[in-house]
């Protein structure tokens, strides 16, 4: 298996070199329609490599994180909400195939048993929020991926799907407290944020001067908070990229990464 994984990584790196891919800004990408097409094809090609050990992300977020980080091994991720850590996971492949470590956070009880079983990293069951130590109502819904804090259950197009739910109280932890609790490095390779509505509240309270992220993916579900998140990230030195691929996520990299 190790030999096959090494071969896969070498093939990816060779293809990237031959295609001379540079992610660039969204504006630059739009001027290069052919390049956009080739990048999209490359993502699809990468998914076919190494048999069943493919992307677990819904929109190839794991492949994006690997590309930005030059397919490094031993990177560091932070992902919330993590669900069961395997299906529709943005970090499963990073951990299992590339030896990354990191933190997963998931307050929905329905996922906890399998999350512990499926992953070998730090797992936090408190709910990530703008403040630590609050006790808030949380709606765990039948479609588990849509579970969220009760105050956000009616905030997007999935409000009707959240009507069948179990509500219970969760303790909260801020993002900065989460990172410090698990001694996260000051430079984190990938941050994945999918909390069904509370993303802006969480990131607005975060001190971006304390930690740097090589890439960030944030679910927005086309709510009014999408552009507010973009403004917040831009004010803190990040730029949005690959809008044509990211669907109801937005993907960000540091402005300083000019070669991407």
Predicted regions and their residues:
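Phosphate/nucleotide-binding beta-alpha loop and adjacent structural elements of enzyme active sites
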Residues: 2-260
